[in-house]
């Protein structure tokens, strides 16, 4: 399309030039004849000439159809462009007139690529416009936020558009300031805060309006609410003892009103929790300051009905007398109390606790007749037993029957394990002439020897307490009412019920000697289906006619802290020596005595080895073999003590050991020497040198 327009434009130029020149011959048809300069003579002769009538003008010139069509197209294009420009002229921004397009097309010039020099931009700190954390924003802009108004800050935080909120708040502030200026001009204020004269006026009005109360009434209310301590504040008044509180003096001379319900009884005994728990201690002394003595109580059963007045004495920090409360490092008043008459007993006599229910309750006919007051009172008030806190403390006991120690006959407890244990007797001071035959049933393994069962029982019975368990008679019974509880079907039939009878006491002379008696074994196991007559056996075991059990001795050695022996003969020799040196009621007591024996052994012979004692006192690590050799040299009985027991005792006394593994030959020789010393000590167990 563009090429055609250019062609039509060239034709028009040629026609215009031909018409404007005078040399153009008349009769020639424009644009149909070849110009003279372009034509040859031969061509001019051959061409047919067309004559144009002279009477026709320029408008009557005939133009070819193609040229006329091109001209029409150009005119139409100009019309369209002119119309488009008229439309654009109606808008605010007028388009500039475009430059005339040259008719001759310009040559295409190759575009040169301009290579711009790349400049390295310096990194600039990027402004963080978006608030990610309110805490971080407040931390970074705390100075500017301090100046801002609180309402403006809160709205900006909630809305998130600080610019919009700032504009709104500034507009409101300007309106408020304008209103304030207008009000200030119209009604100027003289006193923003109250001055002294205004306060006096307000106080006078309040005194006129409020009801008038006398000073004595105010003091009585003050005393009723806070106590008679006007010069102290509430905290100081709460720390003062009742007898140290000083009544406030009335400024107007009027007497104060003391309410009778606030008076304290200074003669009432005061007990602390530590005094009640400790039982017998140095704190349980009579108060000599008050001189108060309680009267004996004739009827003990009326003690529960009486209410003892107890006033709590708060220890005061102003007193110089130290506190008598145990384990207390604070200073305070002495807290003492009076012992009641039924609580006061002879200190030399052993403490006797109340009778409580046990596994085998004794018959009422055989109850002892001594100490009728306590026992009758305890039985009369079986539901409300009064705990004698002045004689007994809250000790931890092994029995689950009662939290207090009880005076009762020897019984066999049935714990959760299969091993039977014997209940130790404590505080047994009086021997009873006779005891009823009591029976207890226990579940035992049918495959276990009955001698092993009673060997553990007999070993714990003291020879001086024969009234607790005189003779044991065993028989295997089957109780249909009490079914044996087993864990699985495989264990069914492997348990039997053993019935133990507590026979009447026999004289000590009737028991045969331990060495002369021959050991007899029970017929075990006995099936539960045998007849009752065939199951009953005579009295075979006593407390003196059976040798100690080997398993029991091994357990005792382990509890006490002795080394295990190879055979029973050595174990019996060690046991006899141990009983002669450390007489005790239980293995735990002998273990404590053995620790004390080691401590006394070192303290008494500390001058013989000054270097070793210096190392011990300065917490210098020593070799265990060195300490063991020293102990053996002092007393050969220490060779029988287990090494773990000695190390535990040394750890409790601050003796530090070190591991010496540098010389294995030396340790081997030491072990050999220790074995030789052990054999020598076993051979010399019954020598006079080992006597206590």
Curated annotation (Swiss-Prot):
GO biological process: DNA recombination; DNA repair; DNA replication
Gene Ontology MF annotations: 5'-flap endonuclease activity
Position of the signal peptide: none
Keywords: DNA damage, DNA recombination, DNA repair, Nucleus, Phosphoprotein
Keyword Phosphoprotein recorded: yes
GO CC annotation terms, alphabetical: Slx1-Slx4 complex
Region annotation Disordered: where it falls in the sequence: 39-59
Subunit composition and interactions: Forms a heterodimer with SLX1.
Task of the protein: Regulatory subunit of the SLX1-SLX4 structure-specific endonuclease that resolves DNA secondary structures generated during DNA repair and recombination. Has endonuclease activity towards branched DNA substrates, introducing single-strand cuts in duplex DNA close to junctions with ss-DNA.
HAMAP family from the UniProt entry: Endonuc_su_Slx4
UniProt name for this protein: Structure-specific endonuclease subunit SLX4
Annotated organism of origin: Kluyveromyces lactis (strain ATCC 8585 / CBS 2359 / DSM 70799 / NBRC 1267 / NRRL Y-1140 / WM37) (Yeast)
Organism taxonomic ancestry: Eukaryota, Fungi, Dikarya, Ascomycota, Saccharomycotina
Gene behind this protein: SLX4
């Amino acid at each position: 399309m563009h090429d055609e327009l250019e062609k039509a434009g060239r034709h028009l130029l040629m026609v215009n030039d031909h018409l404007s020149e005078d040399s153009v011959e008349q009769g020639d048809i424009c644009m149909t004849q070849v110009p003279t300069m372009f034509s040859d003579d031969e061509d001019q002769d051959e061409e047919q000439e067309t004559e144009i009538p002279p009477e026709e003008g320029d408008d009557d010139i005939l133009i070819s159809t193609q040229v006329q069509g091109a001209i029409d197209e150009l005119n139409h294009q100009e019309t369209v462009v002119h119309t488009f420009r008229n439309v654009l002229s109606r808008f605010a921004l007028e388009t500039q007139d475009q430059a005339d397009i040259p008719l001759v097309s310009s040559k295409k010039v190759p575009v040169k690529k301009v290579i711009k020099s790349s400049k390295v931009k310096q990194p600039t700190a990027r402004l963080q416009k978006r608030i990610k954390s309110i805490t971080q924003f407040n931390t970074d802009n705390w100075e500017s936020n301090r100046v801002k108004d609180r309402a403006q800050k809160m709205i900006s935080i909630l809305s998130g558009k600080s610019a919009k909120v700032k504009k709104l708040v500034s507009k409101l502030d300007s309106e408020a300031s304008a209103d304030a200026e207008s009000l200030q001009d119209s009604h100027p204020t003289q006193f923003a805060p109250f001055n002294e004269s205004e306060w006096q006026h307000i106080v006078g009005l309040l005194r006129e309006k409020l009801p008038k109360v006398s000073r004595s009434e105010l003091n009585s209310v003050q005393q009723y609410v806070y106590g008679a301590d006007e010069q102290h504040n509430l905290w100081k008044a709460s720390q003062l003892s009742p007898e140290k509180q000083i009544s406030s003096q009335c400024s107007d001379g009027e007497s104060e009103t003391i309410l009778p319900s606030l008076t304290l009884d200074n003669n009432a005994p005061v007990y602390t929790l530590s005094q009640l728990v400790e039982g017998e201690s140095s704190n349980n002394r009579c108060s000599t300051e008050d001189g108060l003595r309680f009267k004996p109580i004739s009827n003990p059963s009326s003690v529960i009905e009486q209410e003892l007045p107890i006033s709590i004495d708060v220890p005061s920090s102003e007193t110089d007398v130290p506190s008598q409360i145990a384990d207390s490092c604070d200073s305070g008043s002495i807290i003492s109390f009076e012992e009641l008459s039924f609580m006061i007993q002879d200190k030399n006599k052993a403490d006797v606790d109340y009778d409580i229910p046990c596994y085998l309750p004794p018959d009422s006919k055989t109850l002892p007749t001594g100490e009728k007051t306590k026992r009758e009172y305890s039985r009369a008030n079986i539901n409300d037993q009064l705990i004698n806190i002045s004689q007994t403390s809250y000790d931890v006991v092994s029995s689950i029957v009662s939290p207090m120690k009880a005076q009762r006959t020897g019984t066999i407890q049935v714990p959760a394990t299969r091993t039977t244990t014997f209940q130790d007797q404590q505080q047994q001071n009086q021997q009873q002439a006779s005891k009823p035959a009591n029976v207890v049933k226990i579940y035992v393994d049918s495959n276990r020897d009955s001698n092993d069962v009673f060997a553990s029982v007999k070993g714990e019975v003291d020879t001086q307490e024969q009234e607790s368990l005189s003779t044991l008679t065993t028989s295997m019974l089957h109780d249909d009412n009490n079914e044996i509880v087993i864990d699985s079907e495989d264990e069914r039939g492997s348990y039997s019920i053993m019935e133990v009878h507590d026979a009447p006491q026999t004289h000590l002379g009737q028991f045969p000697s331990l060495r002369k008696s021959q050991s007899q074994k029970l017929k075990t196991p006995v099936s539960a289906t045998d007849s009752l007559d065939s199951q009953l056996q005579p009295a075979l075991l006593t407390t003196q006619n059976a040798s100690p059990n080997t398993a029991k001795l091994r357990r005792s050695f382990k509890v006490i802290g002795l080394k295990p022996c190879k055979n029973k003969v050595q174990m019996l020799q060690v046991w006899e020596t141990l009983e002669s040196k450390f007489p005790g009621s239980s293995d735990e007591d002998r273990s404590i005595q053995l620790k004390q024996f080691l401590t006394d052994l070192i303290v008494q012979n500390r001058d013989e080895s000054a270097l070793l004692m210096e190392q011990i006192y300065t917490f210098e690590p020593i070799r265990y073999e060195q300490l063991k050799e020293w102990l053996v040299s002092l007393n050969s009985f220490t060779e029988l003590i287990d090494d773990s027991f000695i190390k535990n005792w040394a750890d409790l006394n601050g003796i530090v050991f070190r591991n010496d593994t540098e010389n294995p030959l030396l340790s081997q020789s030491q072990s050999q020497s220790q074995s030789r010393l052990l054999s020598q000590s076993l051979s010399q167990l019954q020598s006079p040198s080992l006597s206590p």
